[in-house]
Amino acid sequence: MIRIQLGAYQHREDALASWTILKRRHTALLADLQPEVRQVDIDETRMYRLQAGPFSNVDDANLLCRRMLARESECLVIGH
């Protein structure tokens, strides 16, 4: 499954709050995407990655990330 990652946070609540802000700021770009917060443990640090998708192909995900980056928002294509 192809998704984009929009940030990583120390608290799940911060990831969810970030989605609300990003969705408001980039309504047209994120309108058809579903958020997902994924918990990961890196060394002894727990992080929560804010991801959105799914995308049917990597080209669409790359295009959206380029648009997000042009608007000074973080974006990384994952799952390809």
Go through the PLM ranges and name each one:
Residues 10-80:
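Extracytoplasmic
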Residues 1-2:
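Short structural boundary motif marking the start of a folded domain
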